[in-house]
Amino acid sequence: TLNIMAGGTKEAFELALPLLKIMGKNIFHAGDLGSGNGAKICNNMSLGITMIAASESLMLAKRLNIDIKKVHEIMKNASGNSWPISVYPPLPGLIDGTPSNNNYKPGFSVGMMNKDLKLANECAKSVKALTPLGAMALEIYNKFCEEGNENKDFSAISKVVGGDAWNYPID
């Protein structure tokens, strides 16, 4: 389901709303012109960071020889929950129908996430906002793109932090 974040005057938003409802389910008026793009960039920066965090957590559990399915269930119901954990996990075998169960065929590609993280980094610099985790996520996704993974789903980033611990080929 497409989430739409729109910026502009309240009047312009109300005028566009019937068309936006055709395209998406969750529609938000983010504020003035440009605010929709800014909201999307902030949301996707958080998503990129949390996908890496979910990957790191599950990788650590794997290295500690703890059953990944048990850790996943615990995290879904505890303070470690996030969208990547509850809806879109980076490891196969946790939730049916996710890209991790389909050889990381993209829903949202590594290349698109990398683009959004670059935009977030540029925006942060332009307003002198400190986003060290966003900058680190950009470095990680950028390197993954340079290694030829830009067309994989962004959840395949688990391969970077998981290394050989996953033992799941993505090609």
Regions picked out by a protein language model, each given a short descriptive name:
Residues 1-21, 27-29, 42-50, 58-64, ...:
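Short beta-strand and adjoining strand-loop segment in the mid-core
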Residues 9, 32, 80:
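Short coil/turn segments
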Residues 21, 170-171:
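ATP-dependent carboxylate/acyl-activation modules
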Residues 23-27, 82-85:
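A short secondary-structure junction motif
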Residues 28-31, 133:
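General beta-strand structural signal in soluble alpha/beta enzymes
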Residues 35-164, 168:
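Helical "substrate-binding/catalytic lid" subdomain
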